[in-house]
């Protein structure tokens, strides 16, 4: 027998009361986005399950994709069949025969939500267990810790049989907690910050600053590839490329070297906040980790934050670098992040950046710039690209390989 579908059990959604169906529908949409590379798949949701019909598609890549989607508590490959006792008997016998090995123990666990069905749960357990013994007389039943628990669900629309439960990613469906702008440089930390924000249901749009010719097409492709990795956890992501060359050249020419990083970050924050307001976001997310680099001391954060009253979420702020690296490896962004392309934060980095910049000094140096004009020109020049889980071709990988 081939699996008919993957049955998805919802995570924290069970606690969402009147908003439950809104959360479930969002999860359904996210699953459809993530499974877009598999055109035969269909997705249907009810109040306590989401059903991913395979329609002949190999179940293993579908399981691997679904395991990453936030809002999924657990999933099981299942056999779906008509609510017929003879069909159930035959299916249970076939499944257990295919799984049998010497010494195997099993139990039947039936759940009946369709109370109009002809047998109750106890009667089904007895009948189906007896059917297994008919074809496998040497198999042993074990109620407490069996090798195989064959779960049979009798629901209104059909019967479902499964024996494997796979842990999902948990968390909340992406998009159920509002929208935020993720400042993604291309390093190790910001993709991890994005992953953690996605886990709590935040719909992120990626903001990436590009300064050609100082930053290369490879750096841009790298940032887009990191974004594509993040789409596996909740579906499509808008990638916003910000032209930053003019601002960086202005800062380089007019500001003291020690304040280059502080002023650069202040402009980035202003621009990100302007984009957030334009695109109706609620928060800004970044990958700052306290004390990791000069721009991430409390004094630096305070001087940089002063340009906005928008909440700044820093998911990795208390994590050690090794912890961040381990998480980056786990979510498959680390190998991309360490590709040797310079980003906007490194091309004009001073040898001795100020670790305790004074806000008054930063504001004094910024009097040398047309702040509003620079920000407005950057925001008006953004390029927005929708990044999807589906890789249409290998252009990104080929470009990176050619530039390395």
Curated annotation (Swiss-Prot):
Its main location: cytoplasm. Transmembrane segments: none annotated. ATP binds at residues 183-184, 208-209, 265, 287, 296. It is found in: Cytoplasm. Pathway: Cofactor biosynthesis; thiamine diphosphate biosynthesis. Keywords: ATP-binding, Cytoplasm, Nucleotide-binding, RNA-binding, Thiamine biosynthesis, Transferase, tRNA-binding. SUPFAM superfamilies: Adenine nucleotide alpha hydrolases-like, THUMP domain-like. One of its GO terms (molecular function) is tRNA binding. Its EC number is 2.8.1.4. Residues 60-165 form the THUMP domain. Pfam families: ThiI, ThiI_fer, THUMP. It catalyses: [ThiI sulfur-carrier protein]-S-sulfanyl-L-cysteine + a uridine in tRNA + 2 reduced [2Fe-2S]-[ferredoxin] + ATP + H(+) = [ThiI sulfur-carrier protein]-L-cysteine + a 4-thiouridine in tRNA + 2 oxidized [2Fe-2S]-[ferredoxin] + AMP + diphosphate; [ThiS sulfur-carrier protein]-C-terminal Gly-Gly-AMP + S-sulfanyl-L-cysteinyl-[cysteine desulfurase] + AH2 = [ThiS sulfur-carrier protein]-C-terminal-Gly-aminoethanethioate + L-cysteinyl-[cysteine desulfurase] + A + AMP + 2 H(+). It comes from the Bacteria. One of its GO terms (cellular component) is cytosol. GO terms for biological process: thiamine biosynthetic process; thiamine diphosphate biosynthetic process; thiazole biosynthetic process; tRNA 4-thiouridine biosynthesis. Catalyzes the ATP-dependent transfer of a sulfur to tRNA to produce 4-thiouridine in position 8 of tRNAs, which functions as a near-UV photosensor. Also catalyzes the transfer of sulfur to the sulfur carrier protein ThiS, forming ThiS-thiocarboxylate. This is a step in the synthesis of thiazole, in the thiamine biosynthesis pathway. The sulfur is donated as persulfide by IscS. Belongs to the ThiI family. This is Probable tRNA sulfurtransferase. It comes from Streptococcus pyogenes serotype M4 (strain MGAS10750). The lineage of its organism: Bacteria, Bacillati, Bacillota, Bacilli, Lactobacillales.
């Amino acid at each position: 027998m081939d699996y008919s579908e993957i049955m998805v059990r919802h995570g924290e959604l069970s606690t969402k009361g009147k908003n439950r169906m809104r959360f479930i529908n969002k999860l359904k949409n996210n699953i459809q986005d993530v499974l877009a590379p598999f055109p035969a798949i269909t997705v249907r949701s009810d109040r306590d399950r989401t059903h991913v019909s395979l329609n002949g598609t190999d179940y293993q890549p579908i399981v691997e994709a679904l395991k990453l989607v936030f809002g999924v508590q657990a999933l099981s490959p299942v056999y779906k069949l008509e609510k017929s006792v003879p069909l159930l008997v035959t299916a249970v016998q076939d499944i257990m025969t295919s799984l049998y090995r010497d010494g195997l123990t099993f139990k039947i666990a039936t759940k009946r939500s369709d109370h109009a069905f002809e047998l109750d749960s106890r009667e089904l357990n007895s009948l189906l267990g007896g059917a297994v013994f008919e074809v496998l007389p040497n198999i042993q039943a074990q109620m407490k810790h069996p090798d195989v628990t064959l779960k049979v669900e009798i629901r209104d629309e059909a019967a479902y049989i499964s024996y494997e439960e796979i842990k999902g990613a948990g968390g909340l469906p992406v998009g159920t907690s509002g929208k935020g702008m993720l400042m993604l440089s291309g390093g190790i930390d910001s993709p991890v910050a994005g992953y953690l924000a996605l886990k709590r249901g935040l719909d992120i749009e990626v903001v990436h600053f590009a300064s050609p010719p100082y930053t290369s097409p490879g750096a841009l492709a790298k940032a887009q590839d990191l974004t594509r990795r993040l789409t596996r956890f909740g579906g499509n992501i808008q990638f916003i490329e910000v032209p930053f060359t003019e601002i960086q050249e202005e800062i380089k020419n007019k500001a003291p070297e020690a304040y280059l990083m502080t002023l650069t970050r202040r402009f980035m924050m202003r621009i990100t906040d302007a984009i957030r307001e334009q695109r109706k976001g609620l928060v800004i997310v970044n990958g700052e980790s306290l004390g990791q680099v000069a721009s991430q001391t409390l004094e630096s954060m305070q001087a940089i934050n002063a340009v906005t009253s928008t909440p700044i979420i820093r998911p990795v702020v208390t994590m050690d670098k090794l912890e961040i690296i381990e998480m980056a490896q786990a979510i498959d962004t680390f190998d991309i992040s360490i590709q040797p392309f310079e980003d906007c934060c490194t091309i004009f980095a001073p040898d001795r950046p100020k670790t305790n910049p004074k806000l008054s000094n930063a504001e004094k140096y910024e009097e040398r710039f047309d702040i509003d004009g620079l920000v407005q020109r950057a925001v008006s020049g953004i390029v927005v690209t929708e990044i999807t889980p589906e890789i249409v071709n290998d252009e990104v990988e080929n470009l990176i390989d050619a530039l390395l």
